[in-house]
Every structure is written in structure tokens, then in C-alpha cells.
Amino acid sequence: MVLRLRVHSFYNRGISFLVSSSLRNLSTASSLFLNSDQTITEPLVKSELEALVLKQYSHGKFYSLVKNAVSLPCVLLAACQNLSLSANSSGDLADRVSRRFSIEEMGREIREGRFDIRSCCVEFISSSLVLPNLKLKVLIEAIRMVLEIVYDDRFATFSYGGRVGMGRHTAIRYLKNSVENPRWWFRVSFAREMFEERNVDILCGFVGEKINDVMLIEMIKKLFEFGILKIELGGCNSGRGFPQECGLCSILINVYFDGLDKEIQDLRLKMKVKNPRVGTGDEESTGNVFFKPVNIYAVRYLDEILVITSGSKMLTMDLKKRIVDILEQRLELRVDRLNTSIHSAVSEKINFLGMYLQAVPPSVLRPPKSEKAVRAMKKYQRQKDVRKLELRNARERNRKTLGLKIFRHVLKKIKQSNGFKFEGEIENEVRDIFQSWGEEVMQDFMGSLEERWKWHWLLTRGDFLSLRHIREKLPQDLIDAYDEFQEQVDKHLAPTQAKKVLEDEERRVEEEEEQRYAERTVEDLTKLCMKVSAPEELVRKAIKLVGFTNSMGRPRPIIHLVTLEDSDIIKWYARHEKHGSTKKLIRHYTKDLRVSDLDGREEAHFPSEREVKMMGDKNLSDPKPVDGTLSLLLIRLASDEPLHHCAASFCERSDTIMHRVHLLQNRLHINPLDEEKWVPGMGTIHSALNRKCLPLCSTHISDVYLGKITLQDVDSSSFIDLR
């Protein structure tokens, strides 16, 4: 209870800070909010929208968000901007929107409660599928934008999905880089069912705890009632970019599970308090003390929940019981207890977000070089040394030849000058050249122990001047000069000190290698890391099901690409990862794969493996979910239908081509629920859209092939039935 109150006070304090920091943005945009019926030509930027929403915060709640935020024309226009996919269309956004409906009239209907949601529904005959038209999509997007400002900072850090920069790749990256010493884990599995009326009431109750707005609650209930907003738990259609998924699904799922996230967060804090780290940093530096705290890790991507512990199995069982009780009693969800079982992180793999996870020693992720690799590296190093010696000998030979030529040339010029001076001082240039050569020779000489041994032996052998009876008969100046010369020879040419330094360096390298080996051995015995691997068998089954490979797993011709233009085929291939042999062919025939636009820039880029590795994990962003693209086939039609506007949201182009939608499950006559024939975890587009036709311009059909847009980004009222 104390933790809840503390988190609540922190949240209120953060809201107050955000309100105070956003007053400047609010004052600059206040002229847009004074008259809600005035004509708006520019959408709100994010900072202005935050200031507008936070202005409605008072005494721990937000009030009248629909009337004071969602219904404003500037907010609706910002929602249109988010949905707009026609950056190359003529005219500004406000003009393109006004050709379809009036933003001001729509905002007035929303404020007065006259907005008819049912009339904006697109129902498909003989099917339970109901999709929103473009006008209703704008309202849904405006509600989503406002709810995002209200809830995004309030969600737990391990809540992924439906949030900016918090997608599936980021969740997997967190598991890979942050989880240490996992011992036991379990994945919460739900029985496949739709949200029922009781779940909608619970969801609206959670929304009402933070937002006091009857109109918003009624809109959410109507969206559920009319079938536009559907939430299915236990399936594989959430957060995948399918057209049947409403834009509010992700954020409402996060709101529904937010209470569970807070409970898990409190358990993690309590576990840290129970297992404090005793000692100072000096003890850590000795390396003799191993601190292995009991940690609880959790990742939730919408309705997929993974909980990991580094403690005992009894602790994991208690944690599982507590989480399942919250889901079944407080959230009234049906948990599949058979599949929600505890597994050993070391001996068993677990499937989460389409990837296989397993706890392994660090040497599995970063294996040491094998003996064969070490021999190959030594052989390569010897080859480099031989090549370096050859280049050095060639450089000395060329330098000697060039030096003799320079000497002959200078001598010839001096003889021809007869005492006259030239305008250019060739002596200085020659002196600089030979000085630089001499410095390079001396650097090479001083770096070679063999050369120094040789010259030291030549200059010190037969030193009869060191004999006493000889030194007594010679002048003192000659003896002093000889002694000084010998000191300089010993100082600069005696390789004893250099040899000692070299031996110390070799000894240091050996000790460091032994230290690294010892550290790797200790890490393998005391530490576990997370290994993430792709389900290769499922990937092979998927590409075989689509028709990319035959029964033997070998590539086969893709006949459906025949209907595409050459440039579209190349763009289609540009978004697919290549096999090794295909990459070699692409590098060889790169000139044939370069598709340039009117400005001469490449439209499709094929990144190499080296480029991808150099980017690193942190620079890779979460891509747009386009899971339905694999099972979608668009066939270009030769139709006599009159020209239609492009089906993409707010696109004004009328030079469109009609395309027919073919879905994989309908072409193969396979039930996606049959896991033996279908790929487990692979979602599908609703079968009601099979053989529907829609007009698309050349820009947006290319975006479909490149995976930039999906059928979720088109106007649902643009689907046409052609026989």
C-alpha cells in the first residue's frame, strides 16, 4: 500500500511538472482553442497537444477530454496527419481532408454527442468483420493520441507494444542484454477468447479511475458494441498490423494490464529490498566475492507475458500463483493453466514473441577460437610478415635507385651551372628528401633487434683500444673520444634493454591471456546469459507454405511476380533477407538491380551483412508491424472500371490501378487454427477481405511491396467487389 501511494504521488508530481513546463506551448497555441468552430489549417504539434491534454488535469484526474481535446479541429487534423500516407499529393493536408468531410462539423458533432458511429462502419456481408471508414479512423486516432499522452509515462518500463520505440525488437533486445542468471521462467497463456461485456466494463472502470469523461467511456463501449473494436486474447493477431485490428486495441490492452504490471513492479522492488548488496566497491575489485541476487524480470508485449526469476522454483511457483490469481479474479480472464507451466531456463527453450529463448553460459554466445582457427590466424600472420618484408626490401631497392638518380641529376646540374645559382634551391629539396628517408630508415633500424645486434657486434669487436698498455701510449683526447663513442654505441645500439622490454611485453600478453581465460572459466561457472534464436523450422515451413521453396527446401520460381513491373519486383526483393549464394549473385549483378528515380537516387538499397553489423543493436529501430504481408497477394487487374482515387488514406491521386486481394489461407484452403498444416504463431488477415479489389497508385503499391504500409492503412470504404 505504501508503494502504491508513493508511486501515485510521484505520478501526480510528474503531471504537475509537465503542466508547468508546457505552459509556454499552451500560450502559443491558445489562439487555436478559443473558438472550436473556426477554420484550422495547421495541425497541432506534439508539444502543443501535450499542453492541451495536461491542462485538463485536476485533483488526480483528467476531465472532459473528448469535449476539450479530442473534438478540437486542430487535434482532429493532427490525427489526419498521422493517418496521411500521401506526402507527394498536391495541396496541403487541410484541403485534402476538406474534400472528404468537414473537420469543423465533425468536431461539433463529437462535442454535442451527435456523432453517429454506426453510420461510419463498413460491414462485410456474410461475415462478422466490421471496419471503420476514414472519418471514424480519424476519431479513433485522435482518441489514441490523447490516451497516449495520459498513460504512456504511467505504464511500466517492461510494458511493450503500442508505444513509441517499445516494439517487439526492443523487448527481445532487453531480454538479451539485461537478463542475468535466469533459472526459472513461465509464459502466461490465455484461452483463446474475445473480450466480453464484463471485460469491457472492467476496462472502462480502469479508464474512469484516471479520466472523468462520460463521453469517452460511451464511445469506447459503442466501438465494442458495433464490433469495430475487438480484443482477442490468446490469439496471434494483436499488434501485427492486420486490418481487422483497431487502432485503440494496443493502448487499451496496456490499460487493462496496467494493474498487473504495477503488482509485478512492486514485487520486484520488494525482492531488491530483501536482497541488498552488502559491501563496497573495493570488495568487488578483488574478484573473490560473487554476488548473485534474486531478481525478477518481466516482459509483457500486449497480452503475451513472460516472467523470469533467478531464485528457487518455490519462489517462481508462488509468483506464478499470485499472477494467475490476479488475472483470473481481478481481471476475470481465462488462463490456460496447462500451458502456463514453469520451465527450467537452462535445460528447456521457451517460445516468446516468435523467438526461442534459453539460458546459456557466456562461452556459448561468445565462443573462443578453435585450434583450427588459431592455426589459420598464425598462418595468416606469417604471410603478413613475409609480405611486409618483401615490401620493405622493394622499398629499399627503389629508394636506392631513386637516390642514385637524384645524385647524378644534381651533379650534372652543378657541372652545367659553371658557378651560377638557379632560381630554385634544389639543394634544400634534395636535403629534405634524404632527411625524411634517413628518419624512416632509422625508425626501421631501431625497431629491429637483429639489425641492432649486428651493428653493435661490428662496432665493438676487436676493441684493442680498451687494452691498458695500448691506452697508455695514445693521446688522452683520442681515448676520451673512443670511450664516449663506446658509451653512445652501448646506449643506442645495445639491444639488451629493448630485448628486456620486448620480453616484458610478451610476458604481459601471456598473463593477460591467462587472466582472460580464467575470467571466462569463472563466468561459465557462475553466470548465465540469454540466448535468442529464430525458429528456423517454422521459418522454413512458412516460406514453403507461401511457395518460395519446394518440398526439398530449394528456391522455386515465384509465378505471382510475373504481373509486376521490373522495378516493383526489385523493390519486393529489397525487403527480404538473402541467402549466401543469392548475396554473391546480387553483388555481381548490382548494376542490374539499381533502380533510380527522376533525380538519379537509388529507390531500393540492398544492405550487406557488414553494414547491418556495423549499425549495432542500439541503432536498429522497431519496424512497422507488417506480419500480414507474407500471406497477402495483390494481383493487378486489367479493368474497365472508371478511375478511382487511391485507397490510401488522404491520397488524391486518381491514376490508380485496380488490385485484387488474395489471401494465403483461402488459396491453400487451410484453416489457420490447424497447427499441423498452418504455421504456429503466424497470424492471418480476415478472410472477408479475400478477392476484394482496391485501387492503389504506383507510390502506395510500391510501399506495400516494401512493407511500409499494410491494409490497415487504407480506407475500408474503398474495397470494391468485382466479379
From Swiss-Prot:
Broadest EC class assigned to this enzyme: hydrolase
GO cellular component: mitochondrion
Organelle transit peptide residues: 1-26
Entry's localization field: Mitochondrion
Main subcellular location: mitochondrion
Entry EC number(s): 3.1.-.-
Segments forming a coiled coil: none
An individual GO BP term: Group II intron splicing
Annotated zinc fingers (THAP-type), start-end: 646-700
Annotated region (Intron maturase type-2), positions in chain: 532-597
Alphabetical keyword list: DNA-binding, Endonuclease, Hydrolase, Intron homing, Metal-binding, Mitochondrion, Nuclease, Nucleotidyltransferase, RNA-directed DNA polymerase, Transferase, Transit peptide, Zinc, Zinc-finger
Claim: Mitochondrion is one of the keywords in the record: yes
GO molecular function terms noted in the UniProt entry: DNA binding; endonuclease activity; RNA-directed DNA polymerase activity; zinc ion binding
UniProt similarity note: Belongs to the plant nuclear intron maturase (nMat) family.
Purpose: Nuclear-encoded maturase required for splicing of group-II introns in mitochondria. Necessary for mitochondrial biogenesis during early developmental stages.
Protein name: Nuclear intron maturase 3, mitochondrial
Naturally occurring in which organism (per UniProt): Arabidopsis thaliana (Mouse-ear cress)
